Amino acid sequence: MTLQRTPLHQLCQDGGGRMVPFAGWEMPVQFSGLIQEHKAVREQVGMFDISHMGVLRLEGPNPKDALQQLVPSDLHRIGPGEACYTVLLNESGGIRDDLIVYDCGAVDAERGALVLVINAACAEADTAWIRDQMEPAGLTVSDLKAGGVLLALQGPQSIPLLEELSGESLSDLPRFGHRTLSLKDIAHPVFTGRTGYTGEDGAELLLTAADGQKLWQILLDRGVSPCGLGARDTLRLEAAMHLYGMDMNAETTPFEAGLGWLVHLEMPVDFVGRQALEQAAESGPTKRLVGLKLQGRAIARHDYPVLHNGETVGVVTSGTWSPTLEEPIALAYVPTALAKLGAELSVEIRGKAQPACVVKRPFYRRS
């Protein structure tokens, strides 16, 4: 299969990016080194090419009412200029994908617009399914990225840098807020959301291919560290942010995944999967996603068995060495009875049981 390439591919390669296959794309896994990139984001600012992700625009009459049929979160909690994190469900209450929904307000007297950012691995299937559901309701579903660039600028210096580039104060742009910015030397207005996947403050910017290439070079010239998928993974895992296909999938309910806060059963809306989630809420999950810290230096990886008293009771979904905490961390599913802070478990790593303890998530939170 021929891998797709983003408009920043050549710039990433020229900048020393080591390219690897990911979700049908050839993407940089690292540049200067995972630890260095991770620390750049935690301490200053880093940038990521995330142009492999899907970006859809829904436009038409009452788009929130229409999309509400597909998600369990109350979309009417957000207004124009705001966004929320939520999930798409199947009829069994399993998670099809997670996404961010941006409310773009009214297009005219009769139509509104939403922007959805979806995962690369699910983008084709999501787009087809959403289009099948939305078009009968009179909405158009279009590929907003359309060969363009999605760039994530993350870290404590990211917003001050954007303020400098735009000449605007962003002090009134809250987390999960969004607006259009005019950036110095960039030809077109830039859709900018104060969102991210690192546990740090930051923004995600949607640009044309030419504008994205120019902004990448501007940021490089200002000393911003380019970062790859490796650092993106360690950063999101320290922040205990889910990765679809690893920490949750179509067989996982939001209650099991620790995302029950996204489910608003008080809404009088018969969204996809509602009946299954009502039953799941009543019975309670038999397993839960927990955070683990491991003793020693061995790293737990996806699908490693979790043990209790020598018996396999669960499975690791994601694991890494935490550059910030300087110890191994992991996410894992375990029986609800063992999903308690302080529970002593172990993870089988290369045939040996490594002691582990259930700890509070996230592993890292900016103070």
UniProtKB/Swiss-Prot annotation:
Which terms in the Gene Ontology molecular function aspect does this entry carry? Answer: aminomethyltransferase activity; transaminase activity
> This protein's superkingdom?
Bacteria
Give a Gene Ontology cellular component term annotated to this protein. cytosol
EC id: 2.1.2.10
Q: InterPro entries of this UniProt entry?
A: GCS_T (IPR006223), GCS_T_bac (IPR022903), GCST_C (IPR013977), GCV_T_N (IPR006222), GcvT/YgfZ/DmdA (IPR028896), GcvT/YgfZ_C (IPR029043), TrmE/GcvT_dom1 (IPR027266)
Entry-linked Gene3D superfamilies: Aminomethyltransferase beta-barrel domains, Aminomethyltransferase fragment, Probable tRNA modification gtpase trme, domain 1
One short Pfam name that applies is GCV_T
Biological process annotations from GO: glycine decarboxylation via glycine cleavage system
Substrates-to-products reaction catalysed? N(6)-[(R)-S(8)-aminomethyldihydrolipoyl]-L-lysyl-[protein] + (6S)-5,6,7,8-tetrahydrofolate = N(6)-[(R)-dihydrolipoyl]-L-lysyl-[protein] + (6R)-5,10-methylene-5,6,7,8-tetrahydrofolate + NH4(+)
Question: Is Transferase given among the entry's keywords?
Answer: yes
Q: Which UniProt keywords apply?
A: Aminotransferase, Transferase
Instruction: Tell me the protein family, please.
Output: Belongs to the GcvT family.
Partners and quaternary state?
The glycine cleavage system is composed of four proteins: P, T, L and H.
Function (record text): The glycine cleavage system catalyzes the degradation of glycine.
- Recorded protein name is Aminomethyltransferase
Q: Source species, please?
A: Parasynechococcus marenigrum (strain WH8102)
Gene behind this protein: gcvT
